[in-house]
Regions:
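N-terminal Lys/Arg-rich, disordered targeting/topogenic segments
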Residues: 1-18
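Hydrophobic membrane-insertion alpha-helices, especially the h-region
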Residues: 21-37
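N-proximal helix/coil linker or "cap" segments that precede and/or mark the start of modular domains
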Residues: 36-72
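A short beta-strand-turn-helix
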Residues: 65-67, 72-93
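Conserved redox-active cysteine motifs that mediate thiol-disulfide chemistry
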Residues: 89, 97-114
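Thiol-/selenol-based redox modules, centered on thioredoxin-like
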Residues: 170-201
Length: 201
């Protein structure tokens, strides 16, 4: 039996191209990595990043208006200062719900950082989490991120209610939700730049 399996494996391996062999090895390494708890989150984030795509905008008839009550929803920054969405309503708002333990959140973070580097305070970046500031600060420093992080101060408005993270909303200065995306995405894309540039005209 052992010699038979060895022979079958040899024939299988000889028929494979070098590309197929490398693909098989990468797949095996990924499976092994997922079985190791310490590396599972990083590998899951890597895979999520590979499959992420630039999100599209909602059709105009599906772009919900943010209510005045929701504009009063408050969040606190790293220093404890409290803000409401209405403080940012004169510019595009990039509202992202995330967590440090979430692989798809981690996967899209570098792209959000690049988008933030490109636009800075011309766009209101609100990365909202319910984790402790200490844990978030340690994560941000380890990864080298400096996007603005905010913390829940009250329940999330119905317009932004979600069962999954990451979920991202892009809100126009006219208070319309033009993008609602659940899952990792490529945010620093040409399409996204065009959308934000149009909003700021």
């Amino acid at each position: 039996m052992k010699s038979y399996l060895k022979m079958r494996w040899k024939k299988y391996w000889e028929r494979k191209t070098w590309f197929s062999k490398i693909s098989d090895l990468v797949f095996i390494l990924l499976i092994i990595g997922l079985l190791i708890p310490a590396s599972r989150k990083e590998i899951s984030a890597f895979v999520s990043g590979l499959t992420a795509m630039s999100p599209g905008t909602l059709d105009e008839d599906k772009q919900l208006s943010v209510s005045n009550a929701s504009l009063n929803w408050s969040v606190a920054n790293q220093d404890g200062a409290v803000f409401s969405l209405s403080d940012f309503q004169d510019k595009p708002i990039f509202l992202n719900f995330w967590a440090t333990w979430c692989p798809p959140c981690i996967a899209e973070m570098p792209d959000i950082q690049d988008l933030y580097d490109n636009y800075g305070d011309r766009v209101a970046f609100l990365l909202v989490t319910d984790e402790s500031p200490e844990k978030v600060n340690a994560f941000m420093q380890k990864k080298g991120f400096n996007m603005p992080v905010y913390y829940h101060q009250s329940g999330v408005p119905q317009e932004f209610a979600t069962q999954s993270i990451p979920t991202t909303f892009v809100i126009s200065p006219e208070q319309k939700i033009v993008i609602r995306k659940t899952g990792a995405a490529k945010w620093n894309s040409k399409k996204m730049h065009q959308l934000l540039d149009e909003m700021m005209q």
